[in-house]
C-alpha cells in the first residue's frame, strides 16, 4: 500500500513549494518582481528575502538569475515585460508586491493582458500569473491595505483566485501557472504567516481546479 505524505505548512511555505515544483516541471516558467531574488543579484543578499512574504525564497539559488529576476520599482514596466514574454512563449510569474500598486499597471492589464486572447481570435495564448498581496490588518498604510479583487472579476479575459488555506494556496498557484490564460492570485497578508486550518498539504505537485 502506498501513502501520500502530508505536512502542516504555512501558507507561504506552500506557495514557495509550488513555485519550486513548477520551475522544475517546466523550464519556461520564469519569475520577475521587486526583491524576488534577494536584492538585485548581490551575491551576499541572494535568497535573504525571497520577496516581502518569502514566497520566492530559494528560487534564484536553484534556478539562477536568468529565470528569477529582480526588477526596478516600475510595476507597469515589469507587468508589460511579463505580458510580452508570455505572448512569446514563456510562462511568467509577476510578483506585484501589494495590490494597491495594480492601478499603475492598468493599461497593461486591461488593454493588453486581458484582451490579447480575443484580439487574435484565440490563436495567442497568454500564460501569465500575477501574484499580489491583499487585505488590511497589519498596519501597512493606505496604499498597502486594499482588497480589490471585486474589481478585476468583472473584466473578461482575467481569472482571479483568492486561496484561503495552505492546501488551496499550493494547488491554485500551480493551476494558475499551468493555465494558458492570465490569472491574478490574491494572497491575503493575514494568511501568509500562519499554518492554515484546512487540509494538510501533500508533498507532491497537484492542482486545485480554478473555479471549483
What are these language model-derived features?
Residues 193-212:
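Glycine/aspartate-rich loop-and-adjacent alpha/beta segment that forms the canonical ThDP
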Amino acid at each position: 500500500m502506498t501513502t501520500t505524505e502530508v505536512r502542516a505548512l504555512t501558507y507561504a511555505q506552500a506557495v514557495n513549494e509550488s513555485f519550486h515544483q513548477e520551475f522544475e516541471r517546466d523550464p519556461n516558467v520564469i519569475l520577475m518582481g521587486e526583491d524576488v531574488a534577494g536584492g538585485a543579484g548581490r551575491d551576499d543578499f541572494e535568497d535573504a528575502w525571497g520577496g516581502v512574504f518569502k514566497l520566492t525564497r530559494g528560487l534564484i539559488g536553484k534556478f539562477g538569475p536568468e529565470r528569477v529576476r529582480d526588477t526596478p520599482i516600475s510595476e507597469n514596466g515589469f507587468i508589460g515585460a511579463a505580458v510580452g514574454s508570455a505572448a512569446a512563449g514563456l510562462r511568467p510569474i509577476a510578483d506585484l508586491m501589494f495590490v494597491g500598486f495594480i492601478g499603475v499597471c492598468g493599461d497593461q492589464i486591461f488593454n493588453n493582458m486581458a484582451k490579447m486572447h480575443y484580439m487574435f481570435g484565440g490563436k495567442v495564448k497568454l500564460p501569465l500569473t500575477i501574484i499580489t498581496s491583499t487585505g488590511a490588518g497589519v498596519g501597512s498604510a493606505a496604499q498597502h491595505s486594499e482588497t480589490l479583487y471585486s474589481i478585476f472579476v468583472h473584466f473578461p479575459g482575467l481569472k482571479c483566485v483568492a486561496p484561503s488555506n495552505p492546501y488551496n494556496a499550493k494547488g491554485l498557484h500551480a493551476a494558475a501557472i499551468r493555465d494558458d490564460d492570465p490569472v491574478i492570485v490574491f494572497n491575503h497578508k493575514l494568511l501568509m504567516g500562519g499554518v492554515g486550518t484546512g487540509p494538510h498539504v501533500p508533498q507532491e505537485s497537484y492542482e486545485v481546479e480554478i473555479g471549483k
